[in-house]
UniProtKB/Swiss-Prot annotation:
One of its GO terms (molecular function) is ATP binding. One of its GO terms (cellular component) is nucleus. It catalyses: L-seryl-[protein] + ATP = O-phospho-L-seryl-[protein] + ADP + H(+); L-threonyl-[protein] + ATP = O-phospho-L-threonyl-[protein] + ADP + H(+). Coiled coil: none annotated. This is Probable casein kinase II subunit alpha homolog. Keywords: ATP-binding, Kinase, Nucleotide-binding, Serine/threonine-protein kinase, Transferase. It comes from Encephalitozoon cuniculi (strain GB-M1) (Microsporidian parasite). Tetramer composed of two alpha chains, one beta chain and one beta' chain.
């Protein structure tokens, strides 16, 4: 039988709170007036929503129109967003519902930002450290509130370079953490999925977000986007194993008594030092970043540092 693990920190946050804090199945969404908002132009489209730039009077806002999904999923996202308040987390301003279509829309603050793909190459070492600190600050906070984001990736971050400000967006896959609860492994985007998801381990915790953050940091440090580039979920694990090694993967699976690995993973090789991916001439500059990555990008979710532990790493000692 598979070994059930529990988060090393913040494991019982929700158990200590009133059930109304986390029970989205019983949550009733209070909505505002849809007439206050006007759609201006489309900004993007996702699997579960369409996003528009809008206006409230003369104020710019973001309108996230949700596609028809289970009501509980909408309630979960709204309840989580209403529970969170942090400078590095996008602010939910209102929720409205179309009286005819019954489609829900979430109203967010508007952040002036550049597309990540455009600024990816331009970010210098100090930028990388500062934005990493802000991501970890947001994760430390939401984890302390008993919430896992479950979809950390560059596309779910907006960066205002002029103000050196980052905010984490899209909390549609976020979930309340309860120890020993089985969760869906069909979360996170492929390139940022933790190994625990790829071996179908359902008892994951906040450390999933830390792995995903590590993938983002690796992209920025090594200028390799994405860092683990799988063509499918099974190939994603192959790409991870080619860097972290087959032996350590096998030990991880055996330790938690997971289903045996497919024999195809046997020939992927052994662990490669992450420092070997450092761009020429940057080795000394990125020593601390690589040291942190070596601690984060590991198979065993129980051994990854927490967001708080990451923030105490030497990488963030000087800003």
């Amino acid at each position: 039988m598979v070994v059930v693990t529990v988060a090393r920190s913040n494991a019982d946050v929700n158990e200590k709170k009133d059930e109304r804090y986390w029970n989205y199945e019983c949550y009733t969404i209070t909505t505002g007036s849809i007439e206050k908002y006007q759609i201006y132009q489309r900004m993007g489209r996702g699997k579960y929503s369409e996003v528009f730039e809008g206006r409230k009077d003369r104020e710019k806002i973001v309108i996230k129109a949700l596609k028809p999904v289970r009501k509980a999923k909408i309630c979960r996202e709204v309840l989580i967003l209403r529970n969170l308040s942090h400078k590095n987390i996008i602010k939910l301003m209102d929720v409205v519902v179309d009286p005819e279509s019954q489609i829900y829309s979430l109203i967010f603050e508007y952040i002036e930002h550049e597309d990540y793909a455009k600024i990816f190459e331009k970010l210098c070492y100090k930028d990388i450290v500062e934005y990493s600190r802000q991501i970890l600050s947001a994760l430390s906070y939401c984890h302390s509130m008993g919430i896992i984001h479950r979809d950390i990736k560059p596309q779910n971050m907006v960066i205002n370079q002029a103000r050196r400000e980052l905010k984490i967006i899209d909390w549609g896959l976020a979930e309340f953490y309860h120890p020993k609860k089985e969760y869906s492994v069909r979360v996170a985007s492929r390139y940022y999925k933790g190994p625990e998801l790829l071996v179908d381990y359902p008892y994951y915790d906040y450390s999933l977000d830390i792995w995903s953050f590590g993938c983002v940091l690796a992209e920025l440090v090594f200028k390799k986007r994405p860092f683990f580039h799988g063509e499918s979920n099974s190939d994603q694990l192959v790409k991870i194993a080619r860097i972290l090694g087959y032996t350590h993967l096998k030990k991880y699976v055996r330790k938690y008594k997971m289903a045996p690995l497919n024999p195809k993973y046997e020939g992927v090789g052994e662990r490669v030092l992450l420092s070997s991916f450092t761009p020429p001439g940057k080795t000394g500059l990125y020593t601390n970043a690589i040291d942190l990555l070596e601690k984060i990008l590991i198979y065993d979710h129980q051994d990854r540092p927490t967001a708080d532990e990451c923030l105490r790493h030497p990488l963030f000692e000087s800003r």
